[in-house]
UniProtKB/Swiss-Prot annotation:
Superkingdom to which the source organism belongs: Eukaryota
Coiled-coil regions listed in the entry: 302-333, 362-417, 443-476, 869-904
Protein name (database record): TBC1 domain family member 2A
Task performed by this protein: Acts as a GTPase-activating protein for RAB7A. Signal effector acting as a linker between RAC1 and RAB7A, leading to RAB7A inactivation and subsequent inhibition of cadherin degradation and reduced cell-cell adhesion.
CDD domains per UniProt: PH_TBC1D2A (cd01265)
């Protein structure tokens, strides 16, 4: 039975198989060294007979099938004969890979592997197999390289990228041709001419019938029985190529010999046509063996030994005479030096005796003494030189000994090699003395084995080249599919962003219509209310049905993306804000977020620099944020960290209950009620937060615990996920970044920062400050909590964590920058409000309406410049001095009040009954 079909085509699809293939006329695959370029010929259909392995049980075996290719679908159809009207089945080549085995049992066997099955085919010859594999590869590549039917693209982009894409495709095709040389078309086995050939014989007719597709077999048989000769000719029609004139045969099928445009047929190599196992006959090789000189080696060596001994004796005699001559020369030199010394002594004595006066004789003696002194110095210098030379001679002697040992080793090796040579020579002499017939037999068997090995090597080489080309082409196809997928994902993200924008505008329009309609009579307000309810209740399943990802309920850190407000108008506003946030995120993902992620990925080692400062202001990607925060915290608390410090604080908390433990327990349930990590009963975050806050209470007894610290620690836990790291992050914020007394009982530093913010707001945003002052709006009621928890309750999580990225590196100046930027972002909306109650109501949630994090960052770090730290310190010092004076004045008033109360006493006024007196007392 046949394998399970991938897809059974209809009869209408199979009547006209459109597969066309290029037929390159080049050398055969055996000539791998010189691959000729393919010639441009008339396109021909890819079709022909192949054997397909299939079936089950006793009828399992090879079945002859007619295969033809369909270019429109990239499918390879097959039927029992070329005259069948309906194909039996098809093979999807778009996702298939091809393989050929060099060690296959039968020559010409190859495989087509699809995701659902493996089809084993067999061609008539090895050349036909390679031709089919190359053509199938080419057809698959042409199918994947065909321009996809994508949605409309801007004409300018197509005009700009057109030449580049065409050049890229040409380069890829040129690369594919470098692996396996194009194979010549097998004559009579492939193409339309193969349909005219008789069907290859099979062992039995029953074995060739496909029981899996019995219905198709019956249809084809009935079609052939009902047909006449004219119908049979019509059945042959689609398989024969159309000729230029009616009755003339196609010249491209059988090229004429006189046509100069086609290559002449190369004569067959007689060496290749002969059997590879054929070898020269025995008698022709005997004279070569008899002409060898190996049997005369022993006589030549015997005659050469006497001459070598004579030469050695003569060389020894010459060496002795040379040594004797050298000694005679040394003796002559010594006698010559002694003669010169005697003559010099004689001349000195004659000069001494010839002197007439004692003065001259004394001068001669002095001269000789000086000469003796000089000679002594020279003797000492020569002695030193001699010692140095003796030392060098010792070193040279050691080197000579080492070289002698090396020479001895080489001589031993040489002696061993000579022994091996002698043994081999003796063995060779014995082998030459053996009969020639046995030698010829061994030689012929070895040569035959060598021919078989050459055949195997050539087969494996061909297989290797084909597999290399297959891997290369599959990789190219995968890369092209990945590029298409990336382009489609980018376009999908853009369409999602546009959809979010349109939906947010739609909801904003509904909200404006609702506000404008008011309480008018009629069905118009009810219709608006129904539309708003439908927009708010639009489920994610409906978004999936149209292929768009909906707005997720929670973000990456567990915060609600759509805040849960009780009022209907605020619910609609929250939905609009969530859509705008997603729209900004999708639009900025490719243009801004991807380059930023790439820059962070290359930043392996963190060091303080201007580049790191800019990257932190732009925001840290989620996958890098824990690592970056740990590094920022460690820079600030490394002088406070000690091994085991956190565990000691936890042990102290278990041993003794802290006074702030009750307040911490109450605030745990109030920490981020919209975050799933702190509201889920099975979450471990509340327990971690409790331990972090208790450890900090023991770490800093001056502060202990203050409301607001729970939110700081919770943000650190959500990002770092490790409670000890979150503890040190809380320590870094409270003890190293924020000013002292920020969380004291009087919150002195916090109040100072509120006054500083008021001064900066009047300087940077004078119109807004005047407008708020006109309506007597106290901004500290809104902004005090911003500074106390660093915007933890105010901004959406994406913008909040970007603020914290820069805050942990630069300090509190970032908080002032973003506070001013928030008012600048919403300045026009606040100026339009003309009632203090409306302003307070808007300021209560206006920070949640900020969606564009890039715009807010640009305002904070560009529009708010200049923002020197020196000015911030001066303002803090001035306001702190005023605040401390006010606190001292309040303290004095409190003391005066207590003293006045103490002086007046606690006696009740006359006529008043004391609580201690009963009703029945007189």
């Amino acid at each position: 039975m046949e394998d399970a079909p991938e897809r059974t085509p209809s009869s209408s699809e199979s009547t006209q198989p459109p597969g066309l293939a290029r037929e390159p006329e080049v050398v055969s695959p055996g000539d791998s060294e010189g691959c000729a370029r393919p010639l441009d010929t008339v396109p021909k259909k890819l079709c022909g007979y192949l054997s397909k392995f299939g079936g089950k049980g006793p009828i399992k075996g090879w079945k002859c099938r007619w295969f033809f290719y369909d270019e429109r679908k990239c499918h390879l159809y097959y039927s029992r004969t070329a005259q069948d009207a309906n194909p039996l089945d098809s093979i999807d080549l778009s996702s298939a890979v091809f393989d050929c085995k060099a060690d296959a049992e039968e020559e010409g066997t190859f495989e087509i592997k699809t995701p659902s099955r493996v089809i084993t085919l067999k061609a008539a010859t090895k050349q036909a197999m390679l031709y089919w594999l190359q053509q199938l590869q080419m057809k698959r590549w042409e199918f994947h390289n065909s321009p996809p039917a994508l949605p409309a693209t801007p004409a300018a982009a197509l005009a700009e990228n057109g030449p580049t894409l065409h050049l890229k495709l040409e380069q890829e095709e040129a690369e594919l041709e470098e692996f396996l040389c194009p194979v010549k078309t097998p004559t009579g086995l492939v193409g339309a001419a193969a349909a005219l050939q008789p069907v290859p014989a099979v062992p039995s007719a029953l074995q060739n019938i496909s029981l899996k597709h019995l219905g198709t077999e019956i249809q084809n048989t009935m079609h052939n029985i009902r047909g006449n000769k004219q119908a049979q000719a019509a059945a042959h029609g689609p398989l024969v190529e159309d000729s230029p004139q009616g009755g003339e045969p196609q010249s491209g099928e059988q090229p004429s010999i006189s046509d100069p445009s086609l290559p002449e047929k190369e004569p067959e190599d007689p060496a290749k046509s002969a059997p590879r196992s054929s070898v020269p006959s025995g008698p022709t090789q005997k004279p070569k063996r008899q002409s060898n000189t190996f049997p005369f080696f022993s006589d030549g060596l015997a005659r050469s030994r006497t001459a070598q001994e004579k030469v050695a004796a003569l060389e020894q005699q010459v060496l002795m005479l040379t040594k004797e001559l050298k000694s005679q020369k040394e003796l002559v030199i010594i006698l010559h030096k002694a003669l010169e010394a005697a003559q010099q002594e004689k001349r000195a004595s004659s000069a001494y005796l010839a002197a007439t006066e004692d003065r001259d004789r004394l001068e001669l003696v002095r001269h000789k003494v000086r000469q003796i002194a000089e000679l002594n110095q020279r003797v000492e210098a020569l002695e030193q030189g001699r010692e140095r030379l003796a030392h060098e001679a010792g070193l040279r002697e050691q080197q000579v000994q080492a070289l002698q040992q090396h020479v001895q080793l080489l001589m031993d090796k040489n002696h061993a090699k000579q022994q091996v040579i002698c043994k081999l020579t003796q063995k060779l002499t014995e082998d030459l003395a053996q009969p020639a017939d046995a030698t010829n037999g061994d030689f012929l068997s070895q040569q035959e084995r060598m021919e078989h090995l050459k055949d195997d090597m050539e087969a494996y080489r061909t297989q290797n080249r084909f597999l290399n080309s297959e891997i290369h082409q599959v990789t190219k196809i995968w890369r092209k599919v990945a590029e298409k997928e990336k382009a489609l994902l980018t376009k999908c993200a853009y369409l999602q962003a546009r959809n979010c924008q349109v939906e947010s505008k739609y909801l904003a329009g509904l909200r404006r219509l609702q506000e404008a309609a008011g309480a008018e009579a009629g069905d118009f307000p009810e219709l608006l209310q129904q539309l708003i309810q439908e927009a708010l209740q639009w489920e994610a399943g409906e978004a999936d049905s149209v292929g768009l990802s909906p707005v997720s309920e929670y973000d990456d850190y567990g915060f609600l993306t759509v805040p849960d407000y009780e009022m209907e108008d605020l619910k609609l506003l929250a939905k609009i804000q969530a859509l705008e946030v997603r729209s900004h995120h999708l639009l900025a993902h490719e243009a801004v977020e991807r380059p930023l992620r790439d820059r962070w990925a290359t930043l392996t080692e963190l060091t303080p620099s201007a580049e790191l400062k800019q990257l932190l202001r732009a925001g840290v990607p989620r996958e890098h944020r824990p690592r970056v925060w740990r590094w920022l915290v460690h820079r600030r608390v490394r002088h406070l960290q000690a091994p085991g410090c956190y565990q000691e604080l936890l042990a102290r908390g278990r041993a003794c209950e802290h006074p702030a433990a009750r307040q911490i327990e109450l605030d745990l349930n109030r920490t981020f009620p919209t975050n799933k990590h702190f509201t889920c009963p099975t979450s471990s975050f509340p327990d971690k937060l409790r331990r972090v806050l208790l450890a900090f209470s023991w770490q800093n007894p001056t502060i202990g615990y203050c409301q607001g610290l729970n939110r700081l620690a919770a943000i650190a836990l959500l990002v770092l996920e490790d409670e000890e790291s979150a503890f040190w992050c809380l320590v870094a914020i409270v003890e190293t970044i924020l000013p002292a007394e920020y969380y004291s009982k009087t919150l002195t530093a916090s109040q100072v920062d509120q006054r500083v913010l008021q001064d900066l707001l009047s300087e940077k945003l004078p119109r807004l400050t005047a407008h708020l002052g006109q309506h007597r709006v106290d901004l500290s009621l809104i902004t005090f909590n911003w500074f106390l928890v660093v915007f933890a309750d105010s901004l959406i999580s994406d913008i909040l964590l970007r603020v914290w990225d820069a805050f942990l590196y630069e300090g509190t100046k970032v908080v002032f920058r973003y506070a001013l930027a928030i008012f600048k972002y919403n300045e026009e909306a606040i100026l339009q409000l003309q009632d203090s109650l409306e302003i307070y109501q808007y300021l209560r949630f206006f920070t949640k309406t900020i969606c564009d994090s890039r715009k807010l960052m640009s305002i904070a770090f560009n529009d708010m410049n200049p923002f020197p730290m020196k000015q911030l310190r001066q303002l803090r010092a001035a306001h702190r001095e005023r605040l401390e004076a006010e606190l001292r004045e309040l303290e004095l008033l409190k003391v005066e009040y207590l003293q006045r109360r103490a002086s007046l006493g606690r006696a009740p006024p006359e006529g008043c009954v004391s609580e201690d007196e009963g009703e029945g007392d007189s």
